[in-house]
């Protein structure tokens, strides 16, 4: 990676290690740029949804439909993958807290490996 400044945190859990990296753009614009093997560019703010999905056409639209059906507005989106057709990480910044039933609906989809809401 080519960052002037990069902070990386490694957390050890019972399920293994997780690595998260962040940086500052233009000296005052914080960004998350890596989670494990996925690279992306996401603003760490407000309510966020992190999920890993199959990397194939139509997935983003299906997620948007689920969010829209539950009146959750997507403000920003960032995606990262390491190979075409494999798995992709998507980070959504949303305008409000995501109801638990939305997460349950997403996790019930066969193309979603995992999904977590983060509120900062």
Language model segments and positions:
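A conserved regulatory-domain signal marking ACT and ACT-like small-molecule sensing domains
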Residues: 1-120
């Amino acid at each position: 990676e080519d960052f002037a400044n990069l902070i990386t945190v490694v957390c050890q859990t019972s399920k293994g290690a997780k690595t998260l990296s962040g940086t500052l753009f233009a000296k005052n614009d914080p960004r998350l740029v890596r989670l494990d093997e996925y690279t992306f560019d996401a603003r760490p703010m407000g309510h966020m949804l992190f999920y890993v999905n199959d990397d194939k056409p139509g997935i983003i639209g299906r997620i948007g439909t689920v969010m829209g059906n539950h009146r959750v507005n997507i403000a920003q989106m960032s995606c990262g993958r390491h190979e075409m057709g494999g798995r992709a990480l998507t980070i959504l910044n949303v305008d409000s807290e995501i109801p638990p039933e939305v997460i349950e609906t997403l996790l019930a989809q066969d193309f979603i490996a995992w999904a977590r809401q983060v509120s900062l």
